[in-house]
Amino acid sequence: MYYDYRRYPYRPYSPYHRRGPCLRDFGPYPFVINIREAAKANDYFRIALWTGKHLQLTLMSINVGEDIGLEMHPNLDQFIRIEEGQGIVMMGDREDNLYFQKRVYSGSAIFIPAGTWHNLINTGHVPIKLYSIYAPPEHPHGTIHR
């Protein structure tokens, strides 16, 4: 199917520059990016890459020996995909009952139901590079945590 881009209401924009993707929040506009390349290029602890009305994508970089931090989102589901590195993910129904523990590696997909306590600890020798999808959004548009 052919689409007449001259009628498209947004200016075309490429997030890529000579040194890889430019990382900022591109939501809520239509957007396409190589997510693996963007996740690996990210050095921020957390940066919102796309924030919409019902969905948000963030990139994270977890240094060796560090973690995301024990947290729980009462009203949203979360998906995490590890693009580089390794660690241990822990989940449970209470802060003091993280009964689910699994080793995770590059390529691992983690599904976190709403109301589940969770943490991800980097046990490897390189930073964990990942992307996370929240539904609905968890962080304000444009969030950057160094």
Residue ranges, per PLM feature:
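Glycine- and acidic-residue-biased ligand/ion/polar-headgroup-sensing regions
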Residues: 75-92
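Short acidic-glycine-tyrosine-enriched beta hairpin
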Residues: 94-114
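A short, N-terminal "cap"/entry segment at the start of jelly-roll beta-barrel domains
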Residues: 1-56, 69, 102, 145-146
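Double-stranded beta-helix
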Residues: 37-40, 96, 121-146
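Compact, glycine-rich, soluble single-domain proteins
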Residues: 46, 90-92, 99
